[in-house]
Amino acid sequence: MAISKEDILEAVGSMTVMELNDLVKAFEEKFGVSAASMAVAAPGAGAAAAPVEEKTEFDVILLAAGEKKVEAIKVVRAATGLGLKEAKDLVDGAPKAVKEGISKADAEAIKKQLEDAGAKVEIK
């Protein structure tokens, strides 16, 4: 029996950020495509307008662990693959970069998870 779109969406919705990253890489390899978004050329206002470069890599910065420090450590471990001690040191040493050079979608997902855990986070 074929898998429905709803089944696929349900499975993807329950994945962690790291699992989603692995899935995207698998799609890129299997189908020979790239997940990078293509820049769309807007109608030009003339040659005088300089092209604006869109930022493609983002850093997630943990500003403060908040009240639920243990939850923040769990999220940092899941997002980075660090061990317990390394994740605790990162959270205790805030402000620090949790993850650097990642896509905006991944950065937003990690930021949301950390904020849900009570941490203060920014994306640069």
UniProtKB/Swiss-Prot annotation:
* Gene3D superfamilies per UniProt: 3.30.1390.10, Single helix bin (1.20.5.710)
Protein family membership: Belongs to the bacterial ribosomal protein bL12 family.
Subunit structure comment from the entry: Homodimer. Part of the ribosomal stalk of the 50S ribosomal subunit. Forms a multimeric L10(L12)X complex, where L10 forms an elongated spine to which 2 to 4 L12 dimers bind in a sequential fashion. Binds GTP-bound translation factors.
Q: Supply the source organism for this entry.
A: Aromatoleum aromaticum (strain DSM 19018 / LMG 30748 / EbN1)
Q: Which UniProt keywords apply?
A: Ribonucleoprotein, Ribosomal protein
Q: Which GO terms describe its molecular function?
A: mRNA binding; structural constituent of ribosome
Question: In its keyword annotation, does this UniProt entry include Iron-sulfur?
Answer: no
Answer yes or no on keyword Cell wall biogenesis/degradation: no
What is known about what this protein does? Forms part of the ribosomal stalk which helps the ribosome interact with GTP-bound translation factors. Is thus essential for accurate translation.
| A cellular component annotation (GO) from this entry | cytosolic large ribosomal subunit
Q: What is this protein called?
A: Large ribosomal subunit protein bL12
Q: Which Pfam families does the entry link to?
A: Ribosomal_L12, Ribosomal_L12_N
- Stored SUPFAM superfamilies: ClpS-like (SSF54736), Ribosomal protein L7/12, oligomerisation (N-terminal) domain (SSF48300)
Q: Which biological processes are named by the entry's GO terms?
A: translation
